[in-house]
Amino acid sequence: SAILCPIVIPFLHKLKFGQQVRDDGPQAHLKKQGTPTMGGLVFLTAVVITSLLYIRDNPRIIPVLFMTVGFGVIGFLDDYIKIVMKRSEGLNPVQKLIGQFIITGIFVYYLMCSGEVETSMLVPFTGGFEHGIYLNLGFLFIPFVFFVVLGTDNGVNFTDGLDGLCTSVTILVATFL
């Protein structure tokens, strides 16, 4: 993404793909009208390229990559509605959540059908992987995965905004994908 940003950001400026600021928002945000948006494409491209380099050695990357691209599509649609359709709100929260639920549901379904998933989790600070205490979540594993995935995705979304705060958070999340 460090290589792509200097190329893509000026291109987004040229296309006038800038942030639309709501009139009823904070006055401080008005000066940021036109801040380039759709920068998520840069991060998504970097994550996809990096993942594809390792996919042959670790095919377990595929479902996580699917989920990442799916969430990226939701972000793209949100930005597209804001920029091209000139609706500063983009997708409403319910539409975003429905999309996230569908993508996460497909991911969880794949995990459960693959037979490779372990529904037990290590209780922290109980002795490590070999001697620790494990809690078998059983079918509670499904809502747990939804909670973790949707919480992580929306945590990044809440941090995202006009100030470029998403960059540091996205780097952390992408590192642990």
Regions found by a protein language model. Give the residues of each.
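"…together with the soluble PPM/PP2C metallo-phosphatase catalytic core" -> "…together
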Residues: 1-177
